[in-house]
Amino acid sequence: MSKVYDWFEERLEIQAIADDITSKYVPPHVNIFYCLGGITLTCFLVQVATGFAMTFYYRPTVTEAFASVQYIMTEANFGWLIRSVHRWSASMMVLMMILHVFRVYLTGGFKKPRELTWVTGVVLAVLTASFGVTGYSLPRDQIGYWAVKIVTGVPDAIPVIGSPLVELLRGSASVGQSTLTRFYSLHTFVLPLVSAVFMLIHFLMIRKQGISGPL
């Protein structure tokens, strides 16, 4: 085993990387509220894992979506648990994200030189809300249908470009198969990928600049 480790150590300097991570200075004013961002990340990882598991059974069609969710909840092994954890961690992620934003704002963590860290955090907050909107429509039940119809209909009030925006979001004039396909693609591929990129940027900047000092 040591020979395998030595082989990787010689090429990648694993120990130096580990020492850099574990020896990072943590200011004495840091408390449990500074963990809210990490908890949000943990919820995101739980979302990815449970969401991936459900893709094996979920069918993104208007005729089969609701039935496939019922199958997950009643027939698939531990499906009820996986979907419940997905739902609970989604709510927890939103809550932790909101508390994290408040903590950063109240402690002045958005000030110079951390403006870009704040901007990426705001982008991540918008992405989190987008997860909620797109995921809400996937069961294709009455609540999800009308929620999506209302949300996608909001841009219709914008002069000139309102109607084209609505059609772009829905894929057609009304909420249907095109809408479900769009939201499923956004929820399972586009949003997770974009979120992962912004999270990486966010964490690299925090790593570079360190934790903000007390007020």
From Swiss-Prot:
Binding locations of heme b 2: 86, 187
Cofactor(s) this protein requires: heme b; heme c
Biological processes annotated in GO: photosynthesis; respiratory electron transport chain
Positions annotated to bind heme b 1: 100, 202
Gene Ontology terms, MF aspect: electron transporter, transferring electrons within cytochrome b6/f complex of photosystem II activity; metal ion binding; oxidoreductase activity
Intracellular or extracellular location(s): Plastid, Chloroplast thylakoid membrane
Keywords: Chloroplast, Electron transport, Heme, Iron, Membrane, Metal-binding, Photosynthesis, Plastid, Thylakoid, Transmembrane, Transmembrane helix, Transport
InterPro entries in the record: Cyt_b/b6_N, Cyt_B6_PetB, Cytb/b6-like_sf, Cytochrome_b_N_euk/bac, Di-haem_cyt_TM
Membrane topology of this protein: Multi-pass membrane protein
Sequence intervals crossing the membrane: 32-52, 90-110, 116-136, 186-206
Keyword Thylakoid (UniProt): yes
Cofactor note as given: Binds 2 heme b groups non-covalently with two histidine residues as axial ligands. Binds one heme group covalently by a single cysteine link with no axial amino acid ligand. This heme was named heme ci.
GO cellular component: chloroplast thylakoid membrane
Main location: plastid
Residues the entry annotates as binding heme c: 35
PROSITE patterns reported for this sequence: CYTB_NTER
Signal peptide: none
Gene3D superfamilies: Cytochrome Bc1 Complex, Chain C
Function, as annotated: Component of the cytochrome b6-f complex, which mediates electron transfer between photosystem II (PSII) and photosystem I (PSI), cyclic electron flow around PSI, and state transitions.
Subunit structure: The 4 large subunits of the cytochrome b6-f complex are cytochrome b6, subunit IV (17 kDa polypeptide, PetD), cytochrome f and the Rieske protein, while the 4 small subunits are PetG, PetL, PetM and PetN. The complex functions as a dimer.
Family: Belongs to the cytochrome b family. PetB subfamily.
Further details from the record: Heme 1 (or BH or b566) is high-potential and absorbs at about 566 nm, and heme 2 (or BL or b562) is low-potential and absorbs at about 562 nm.
PANTHER family found in the cross-reference section: CYTOCHROME B (PTHR19271:SF16)
UniProt protein name: Cytochrome b6
Organism per entry: Pelargonium hortorum (Common geranium)
Gene that encodes the chain: petB-A
